[in-house]
Regions:
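Active-site proximal loops enriched in glycine and acidic residues that flank catalytic Cys/His/Asp
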Residues: 47, 71, 100-101, 282, ...
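Short linear, low-complexity motifs centered on an aromatic residue
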Residues: 76-92, 109-112, 215, 222-224, ...
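C-terminal low-complexity, glycine/proline- and small-hydrophobic-enriched intrinsically disordered tails
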Residues: 430, 466-472, 494-677, 694
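Basic/polar N-terminal segments that are highly enriched at the extreme N-terminus
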Residues: 1-8
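Hydrophobic topology marker
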Residues: 685-687
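Active-site core of metal-dependent hydrolases
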Residues: 10-125
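Glycine-rich, acidic/polar active-site loops that bind/position phosphate-bearing ligands
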Residues: 125-314, 323-326, 333-572
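Conserved small/polar residues in nucleotide/adenosyl-binding loops
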Residues: 678-683
């Protein structure tokens, strides 16, 4: 047996959490910090100094030499600048370790060097980071040493949000405020806050690092641009939940330990559908902490993989022909006195509060399906969505048989007198127990599915931050809650008003419910008849952010200003254009410097073989046929390469970033696909096989 691991002892040991604060802070200071965490507000300068000193002392005792304001700019990954704790030496030349409350609360990175969509120019560089007191500081150890990481928000000198966290925190306040209005109407006077909770299921690939380093396309783009299918892929369906191989198991073990030390509740691990694909799922947490922890998970996966001679691939579609990777975003809302607003109970037809919440969510998703789709838009996700492995690009809601039956009754009669029950599942084996059976099945093809006491948003890409999807979810549901509360707070007869409102919302927005096969062509046709948007690509979703509907929504709840939304639309176009340009240039480079020279060399060998066989007095029928085929494909590839070079140059020279991004989508990408198709039949030497294991 291996050494026994005491998970309880190591969990959170590298986190400055509430337990550590309680031990190290004076009682009155701890109470003030806890109050600000729970109710908002600011710490007094004196309190901030005490907290900063305690945090610094704890970090230094654990080997830290530097601290950083750890934030999430609009690149989608985290950013950090390390400052050491050293201060001015005293008169005796002794170094003093310093860290003030001001340094804890505020930092000042260069705002012009991050994506801003025009909010910051090069000569307007000042930006600020602000401590997110609700997300605990943690220690990160790597080749640079031990660093104290302080989760922060990031904004410009003029106050615009330049990150993913600030809008998320704003949206959390919005949904809390509006949800409280609803629960108050149902007599709950104890709750003071409603929290959005999130649990993201992170999928990823692991490949051997040495094989990875031989692939220029994987290095530069995160996915293979050339290659042929492996003889065996996922056809036998034997990888999903299969036995975890030793090398991968060793990686997972180290990953768990690293994450547990960082306070990340890594819970579930298993093989996924595609060869070399795996999943890690944590326990639910408050939305902003879940976002921070998901960034930590992705970063730690990459670091631990290197240690094991592996490379972690987070791209949504690193290999054609097998499933890509997503990040199912499980979302629920809970009061601080312990009530999950998405828990239907044993008899959901009698749970009026749940039915109102459900009706509001149906309304929110129907009205803002375009925004929800945009929140999961990503360059890599364009290759994954709607490919019989992931949800379609059409937003719909799966409720299951039980809730759909309740909704049907409410629409038809205004009340639901019954609901379907789960019953028992008989195994037919005397030594096995009869199993409690859920009242409804699960639908893996739905992009937004109710799964018992939460909604699972399955569109999110594996490499993407979960901040935007949860910001959007919180915002659109907050709006629906607000509009419902506006009606019900004025009602003379609350019981009648709430029943009428539930029926109204469900009747008007029933079109968004779909319990069938989301992969089918019939659903695409049906969705069009229902008037549901089918937004197929990242850049086609960009302008949904700046419609009047979207601007009114986000400005009403102070989540985004119009300028912030316009900047994000601009960044989407820029990101898309740059990403596709990198792929095109990588493809050009590989074709011109690696593949075509290899084909030429191969054809030379074939030509020599033809001559040698002829010289031996035998007709080289097969060899000549193969040589002709290779030369024909070589000519096609060279011609296609010339077209791609021309189209890439034309697109990269464009100045209008929106027009440029669509040029890449409509012209450059098809040129890339054309060149790939000319090569596949003959270039057996380019096989990019999916490994059965890393």
């Amino acid at each position: 047996m291996s050494e026994v691991l005491n998970v309880e002892a190591i969990f959170g040991e590298n986190v400055f959490n509430l337990g550590t604060m309680r031990e190290r802070l004076p009682k009155n200071v701890y109470k003030e910090v806890k109050k600000v965490m729970d109710q908002g507000g600011e710490l007094s300068p004196a309190t901030a100094d005490i907290v900063a000193k305690a945090m610094k002392d704890w970090a230094v005792e654990n080997g830290a030499t530097h601290y950083t304001h750890w934030f999430q700019p609009l690149t989608g990954i985290t950013a950090e600048k390390h400052d050491s704790f050293i201060g001015h030496p005293d008169e005796n030349g002794k170094m003093l370790m310093e860290f003030s409350g001001k340094e804890l609360i505020k930092g000042e990175p260069d705002a012009s060097s991050f994506p801003s969509g025009g909010l910051r120019a090069t000569f307007e560089a000042r930006g600020y980071t602000a401590w997110d007191i609700t997300s605990p500081a943690f220690l990160k150890e790597d080749a640079t040493g031990v660093i104290l990481c302080i989760p922060t928000a990031f904004c410009s000198y003029t106050g615009e949000a330049l990150d993913k966290k600030t809008p998320l925190l704003r949206s959390m306040e919005a949904i809390s405020e509006q949800a409280l209005r609803l629960v108050r109407l149902f007599g709950n006077t104890r709750a003071t806050k409603v929290t959005a909770s999130v649990g993201p299921e992170q999928e990823y690939f692991l490949v051997d690092r040495q094989k990875y380093l031989k692939r220029q396309d994987l290095i530069f783009t995160g996915r293979t641009l050339f290659g042929a299918p492996a003889p065996k892929g996922q056809e036998l369906e034997d990888h999903y939940f299969g036995v975890i191989r030793e090398r991968i198991g060793a990686f997972m073990k180290d990953l768990n330990v690293e994450l547990w030390k960082l306070g990340v509740t890594a819970k579930t691990q298993h093989n996924e559908v595609a060869p070399a694909q795996h999943e890690l799922a944590p326990i639910y947490e408050t939305a902003n902490i879940a976002v921070d922890h998901n960034q930590i998970i992705m970063e730690t996966m990459k670091k631990v993989a290197e240690r094991h001679g592996l490379r972690c691939l987070l791209n949504e579609k690193p290999f054609a022909g097998v499933n890509g990777s997503g990040k199912h975003n499980n979302w629920s809302i809970t009061t601080d006195d312990g009530m999950n607003l998405l828990d239907p109970g044993e008899t959901p037809n009698e749970n009026i509060q749940f039915l109102l919440v459900l009706a509001c969510i149906l309304k929110a998703v129907d009205i803002h399906a375009d925004l929800l789709r945009q929140s999961a838009a990503d360059v890599g996700n364009d290759h994954r969505l709607g490919a019989n492995e992931a949800p379609p690009a059409i937003i719909s809601v799966f409720l299951g048989e039980q809730l759909e039956d309740v909704v049907r009754q409410l629409i038809e009669t205004g009340e639901a007198k019954s609901c379907l029950l789960g019953g028992k599942l008989m195994t037919g084996v005397s030594t096995l127990p009869d199993l409690p059976k859920d009242a409804t099945d699960r639908n893996r093809t739905s992009p937004f599915a109710f799964t018992g006491n939460k909604f699972e948003f399955r569109m999110v890409g594996s490499a993407d931050s979960i901040a935007s999807p949860n910001t959007t979810l919180n915002a659109i549901v907050a709006e629906a809650f607000c509009e419902a509360a506006d009606v019900l707070e004025k009602a003379d007869d609350f019981d009648m008003a709430v029943h009428d409102l539930i029926k109204k919302y469900m009747t008007e927005h029933h079109r968004i419910i779909f319990n069938g096969n989301g992969y089918s062509d019939e659903w695409v046709e049906e969705a069009a008849k229902r008037g549901l948007p089918n937004i197929k690509s990242m850049i086609e979703s960009a302008n949904t952010l700046t419609t009047e509907k979207a601007v009114q929504l986000f400005e009403k709840f102070h989540i985004f200003t119009r300028a912030e939304l316009e900047s994000r639309e601009e960044i989407i176009y820029e990101t898309y254009a740059k990403s596709i340009n990198i792929e095109a240039l990588t493809m050009i480079d590989m074709a011109s410097k690696q593949i075509i020279p290899a084909v030429v060399k191969y054809s030379q060998k074939l030509a020599k073989t033809v001559l040698d066989v002829k010289a031996a007095g035998v007709e080289p029928v097969v060899q000549s046929e193969l040589l002709a085929k290779v030369n024909s494909k070589l000519t096609e590839m060279k011609e296609a390469l010339s077209v791609l070079e021309k189209e890439e140059a034309a697109a990269s020279a464009m100045e209008d970033v929106k027009a440029q991004s669509f040029r890449y989508k409509d012209v450059v990408i098809p040129a890339m696909e054309d060149r790939k198709s000319t090569r596949l039949n003959s270039s057996h030497w380019l096989r990019s096989r999916m490994p059965s294991s890393a």
